[in-house]
Amino acid sequence: MQFGISTASLYPMLTEEVLAEHAVPCCEIFFNTLSELAPSYVRKLKKIADQGGIQILSTHPFTCAFEPFMLFTGYDRRFQDAIEWHKYYFEAMNILGAKIFVFHGDRKQGILSEHAYFERFAVLRDLGKRFGITVAQENVERCRSGSPDFLEKMIRYLNGDVALVFDNKQARRAGVDAIAFVRQFAPYICHIHISDCTDNCDCTPIAPHSPQICLLLNELKKMGYEGGAVVELYRNLLQKDEDVFLSLQNLVEAYCIN
């Protein structure tokens, strides 16, 4: 398993500063704006990452908030334009060497049928394949993908040609047991967003020897998972930025003692 952080955890710190100031083995890049897709900027990020020995596993688009409007619209021309727009992401990913594109999808109240959703996802999935990119559906609570039943239907409809990002805090918010999710979808999970929790907060830094993190990692081991697991936290919930890197350290230690 590969462990790292999401640069989103330190938002709004500039991404290049996160990479330059903190040596981590792996990371997920959160693109925050249009100019960060410019080849000159992306090459700069790649150089900084290489100098720090950082492998970029995945990227997360700032347009995830617009995916319902762009990709799951009733206006076909907007959908086609949105598909073309994603080429900018995939070209940037090719420069970075990132292989996994994190996808949220439509909101729960989306206007399209489930089958239409699956077919549109497949268009983006197939475009990603042309660039050597895996478009991976994340289980986001506020989206249709927050439902395991929906994901199961999606996998069946697309004949198993679906990759998933598993986010354990999103599972908590949806009332879904993390262990049950892993057991159900293990063959399709290619990437993980991970955080800890308390009775009072569903997204906290990873505590030393956290029982729930140890259980999750043990289950992932049993299922043969070998992909990435990146710490994804919300900066406004942190007492200090160092909590992100302490979480990574605690995550690695939890894996080693399992």
Task: Locate predicted features.
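Hydrophobic faces of well-ordered beta-strands that scaffold small-molecule active sites
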Residues: F3-T7, C27-I29, I56-P61, F101-F103, ...
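Acidic/histidine-rich catalytic cores of soluble enzymes
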Residues: C26-C27, V123-S210
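A structural motif
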Residues: V24, M93, G97-A98, I189, ...
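N-terminal pre-domain/capping segments
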Residues: M1-F90, N94, K129, A163, ...
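Charged helix-capping and loop-helix junction motifs
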Residues: S40-K44, F79, I83, E114-A122, ...
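Active-site acidic/histidine proton-transfer and metal-coordination neighborhood
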Residues: P68-A163, D243
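Acidic-and-aromatic substrate-binding clefts and catalytic sites of carbohydrate-active enzymes
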Residues: S6-L14, F30-K44, K108-H115, R142-S147, ...
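H/E-rich (His + Asp/Glu) clusters that bind or coordinate divalent metals
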Residues: L215-L216, M223, G228-A229
